[in-house]
């Protein structure tokens, strides 16, 4: 039986298997199968039809010799019968079945409203289709858009992907669950701003936190957990293309009209007073605008109220809340460059960067294999890995991908924010902080030696508390012959007594090494060609790029019995000033001048010349608990201290090798020094030798202010700092809203429970 050309209608090819496009065959596949719209290998109807027309002539001759009747019986006689089974093969189960379902689908689906989390491996496929090349070397290839956040994220954005937010969309909720149960369940991870339960009968609720770290912690801990015999399905919820006023990203502030001389560290000093800063970001080609992102929305609100319309470096700044949507903005600009003329649209639609959701440390040590592991073994791309050449697996550096339209390529800006001191209003009246104009943009690198791919780094805790490694300090401290500019922000922002610093020991942050002053290194292949760190890392091969101290200045008294000591600052010798003059250095200083800053001088203490009371106890065995440390201290120093904090590595469930203690008076420092410094520890047969140094944050009040809004207050109370009320009794006095304050009672707070320790 001959089959004439054209008998195979184009519509009938919907029933052909998609595998037909993968294998050559003399006969088409006629077997009926369901349509798979997600099959990435299916061909268009026109392509398949043209191919079948090409083979139709030969098919007739081949069928003459064989059994043609079964095939003839399968063909329909008329056109209606040909289309009759088409709809039967379509899977309509995903469409809403009721009016209520239709409303939910409209609110949370792809048509608008809130964007739900997508599968990370789904996003991986999309990301690879947008692969870009940073330079001509294949080894240096990095995807521009890789993964979504919330599941082992890395730097990079997907235009329509999900980013961590402070609001969680919780599905599969049992309608019998009480609101109080939900409140108690989610409140253990942080203060809840709003709990929306009006749609609980439909199976979902919305939980909004003030702190983005709380929402991420809740998602990690509760994802898939059973609640009333139902597994929770949790997603981040963020506004889509046209956010309303209530969807404004309250945690990120846009700073307009900045002077070019104001660096990220300057902004950190100014804005960090109001809360912990997650990130400070720059905008390509517009250095007079920057984004300051806080972990907590309340901190951003406080900074907005206090600093809006104030002057920094002689220019009046303007602050506004940022809006999500910057990733979509970049794509729209490529299609319509005229949008670039609208500055307000550009900066009010800046998306939250997914950088902070990147896991701390190296992916190779992660319990979850990252999806690029298999991709990096490709024979085409070679050894591709985002953690390639990272030699310090416990320290993760923030990197942000910034699209430079003029140069047509993507640069990696290393913008890790490190801790710096903050000052209150009273201190500025007596001594205003001076910052040389030549500092430019500051980063948290240590000494960059002559090797082009080697960068030494200080861990965040060392920046926070001081006591750096000697290898991080230069031969000569920094000084400048230029006129220094001042930042007159203290006159407008009222009382700035709360001292906040970046970082509060997230999981896996602290190194496993018992020696906390050890230095790690991060290497970048071809770094000099495709890496910028603010303005200072243009040439990483320069041997003159050093970690330098700020200009010599005495300790600053904050007005509340606390002292602040100057922090280290990194500048580039090779980076000229804007007017062409170069930086100069004082040759009279040496490395010892910097290190002595945090060393204890018993003679000065005995003469009353050193008022500092907060100490860092280093080289503590990692198995020591807080109670063990308290017992060791109380053997000879009971009642001489009023604050103790033993940082915990939550990943490894042990301490990180050091602790911080505040003595009631400087005179008690000598006894503690004699009891511990240079001595071995009694327990666990440890060979570690204890050593003492001064901490950077000084004074009980400053320590309490630092931890007031820290996410550490959401952790187990055994991991939190404790404040004592003198020699009579000792209690942890952490209260609601994650605040510390000294206890003046011999009864423990009801939120804490029984006494932790008594003398």
Curated annotation (Swiss-Prot):
Cited CDD domains: RRM1_MEI2_like, RRM2_MEI2_like, RRM3_MEI2_like
What exactly does this protein do?
Probable RNA-binding protein that plays a role in meiosis and vegetative growth.
Record-level GO cellular component terms? nucleus
One GO BP: positive regulation of growth
Pfam families per the record? RRM_1 (PF00076), RRM_2 (PF04059)
Q: Which organism is it from?
A: Arabidopsis thaliana (Mouse-ear cress)
Q: What happens when the gene is disrupted?
A: Early flowering.
SMART domains in UniProt: RRM
Q: Which PANTHER family match?
A: RNA RECOGNITION MOTIF-CONTAINING
Keywords, A to Z, come to: Meiosis, Repeat, RNA-binding
Q: Name one GO molecular function term.
A: RNA binding
Q: What is this protein called?
A: Protein MEI2-like 3
């Amino acid at each position: 039986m001959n089959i004439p050309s054209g008998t195979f209608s184009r519509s009938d090819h919907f029933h052909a298997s998609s595998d037909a496009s993968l294998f050559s065959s003399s006969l088409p596949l006629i077997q009926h199968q369901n349509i798979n719209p997600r099959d990435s290998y299916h061909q268009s109807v026109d392509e398949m039809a043209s191919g079948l027309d090409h083979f139709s002539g030969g098919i007739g001759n081949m069928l003459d010799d064989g059994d043609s009747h079964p095939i003839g019986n399968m063909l329909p006689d008329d056109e209606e019968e040909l289309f009759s089974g088409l709809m039967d093969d379509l899977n309509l189960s995903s469409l809403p079945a009721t009016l209520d379902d239709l409303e939910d689908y409209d609110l949370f689906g792809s048509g608008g409203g809130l964007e739900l989390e997508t599968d990370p491996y789904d996003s991986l496929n999309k990301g690879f289709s947008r692969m870009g090349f940073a330079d001509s070397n294949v080894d240096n290839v990095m995807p521009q858009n890789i993964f979504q956040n919330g599941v082992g994220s890395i730097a990079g954005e997907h235009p329509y992907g999900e980013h961590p937010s402070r609001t969680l969309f919780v599905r599969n909720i049992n309608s019998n669950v009480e609101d109080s149960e939900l409140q108690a369940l989610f409140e253990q991870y942080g203060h809840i701003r709003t709990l929306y339960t009006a749609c609980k009968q439909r199976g979902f609720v919305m939980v909004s936190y003030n702190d983005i770290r709380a929402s991420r912690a809740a998602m990690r801990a509760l994802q898939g957990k059973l609640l009333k015999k139902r597994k929770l399905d949790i997603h981040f919820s963020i506004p889509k293309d046209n956010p309303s006023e209530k969807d404004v990203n309250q945690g990120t502030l846009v700073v307009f009209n900045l002077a070019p001389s104001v660096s990220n560290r300057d902004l950190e000093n100014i804005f960090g007073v109001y809360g912990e800063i997650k990130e400070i970001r720059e905008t390509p080609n517009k250095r007079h605008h920057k984004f300051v992102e806080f972990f907590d929305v309340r901190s951003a609100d406080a900074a907005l109220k206090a600093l809006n319309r104030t002057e920094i470096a002689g220019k009046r700044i303007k602050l506004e809340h940022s809006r999500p949507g910057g990733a979509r903005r970049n794509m729209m600009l490529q299609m319509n460059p005229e949008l670039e003329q609208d500055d307000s649209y550009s900066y009010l639609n800046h998306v939250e960067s997914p950088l902070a959701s990147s896991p701390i440390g190296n992916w190779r040590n992660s319990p979850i294999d990252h999806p690029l592991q298999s991709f990096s073994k490709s024979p085409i791309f070679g050894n591709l890995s985002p953690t390639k050449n990272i030699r310090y697996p416990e320290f993760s550096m923030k990197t942000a991908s910034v699209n430079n339209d003029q140069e047509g390529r993507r640069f990696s800006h290393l913008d890790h924010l490190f801790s710096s001191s903050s000052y209150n209003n009273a201190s500025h009246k007596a001594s205003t902080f001076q910052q040389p104009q030549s500092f430019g943009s500051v980063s948290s690198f240590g000494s960059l030696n002559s090797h082009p791919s080697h960068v030494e780094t200080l861990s965040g805790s060392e920046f926070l508390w001081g006591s750096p490694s000697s290898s991080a300090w230069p031969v000569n401290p920094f000084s400048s012959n230029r006129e220094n500019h001042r930042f007159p922000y203290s006159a407008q922002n009222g009382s700035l007594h709360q001292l906040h610093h970046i970082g509060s020991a997230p999981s896996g942050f602290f190194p496993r090494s018992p020696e906390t002053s050890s230095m790690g290194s991060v290497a970048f292949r071809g770094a000099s060609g495709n890496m910028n760190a603010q303005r200072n890392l243009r040439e990483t091969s320069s041997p003159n790029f050093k970690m330098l101290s700020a200009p010599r200045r005495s300790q600053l008294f904050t007005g509340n019995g606390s002292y602040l000591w100057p922090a280290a600052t990194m500048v580039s010798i090779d980076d000229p000033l804007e007017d062409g003059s170069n930086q100069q250095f004082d040759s009279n200083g040496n490395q010892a001048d910097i290190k002595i800053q945090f060393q204890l001088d018993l003679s000065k203490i005995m003469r009353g010349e050193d008022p500092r009371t907060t100490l860092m106890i280093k080289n503590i065995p990692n198995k020591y608990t807080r109670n063990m440390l308290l017992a060791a201290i109380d053997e000879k120093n009971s009642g001489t201290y009023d604050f103790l904090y033993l940082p915990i590595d939550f990943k490894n469930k042990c301490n990180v090798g050091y602790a911080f203690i505040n003595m009631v008076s400087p005179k008690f420092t000598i006894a503690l020094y004699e009891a511990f410094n240079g001595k071995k520890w009694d327990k666990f047969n440890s060979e570690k030798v204890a050593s003492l140094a001064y901490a950077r944050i000084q004074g009980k009040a400053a320590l309490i202010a630092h931890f007031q809004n820290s996410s550490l207050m959401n952790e187990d109370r055994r991991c939190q700092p404790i404040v004592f009320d003198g020699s009579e009794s000792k209690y942890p006095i952490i209260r609601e809203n994650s605040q510390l304050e000294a206890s003046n009672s011999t009864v423990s707070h009801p939120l804490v429970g029984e006494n932790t320790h008594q003398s």
